[in-house]
Amino acid sequence: MANGSSVELPIGLTDDEIARLGEIYLMGRDTDPPPSPVRNIAEYERMQGVLIRYPFGISTDIISEISQDLIVYCLVSSNQQNNANSILENSGVNMENVDFVIGPTDSYWTRDYGPWWIVDGNSDVSIADFTYNRPRQNDNEAPLKMSNHLDVPYYATDLIHAGGNYMTDGLGIAASSDLVYEENLISEHDVDSIMQA
């Protein structure tokens, strides 16, 4: 829900967001890069949890199934946590495997705006945060919220890049479409340098 409204935002840009595209360039953060070498964790690797958001964009049947084996990290605003808890309990979700991460969001597209997981040069599982390619400030804050919640190292760049446009094999090969070049106001070489840092 966009800033508490009852309308879910689409995966694409709304007309209002198109008019506010310039806000994206103000949402980024920049920290020191992680210590080298960095290994990007592939999505298909063994994991301990899954990140979702309330109101949900997936069925509670799927959430219930996930909760049998993994932790379900659920981004939820403080004023909606009781509702989320009730719905999950009434749907047979294993509540011992639900961990609420408190904070507002704008949409349920967590794969696009959520954290990117890496193993940094200190062998710490850490979060890499890229600026979300939508003017949705609450969504853009999700990786930092997760880092604070889990107390894991956090590394950010103001490079605009959506998680849905990124795949890695976890062994040093990654792929994205040219969208990452089109959305940033820097050269392709500079984008590549940031991604390889």
Describe each PLM feature range.
Residues 1-197:
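The feature marks the mature, well-folded catalytic cores of soluble enzymes
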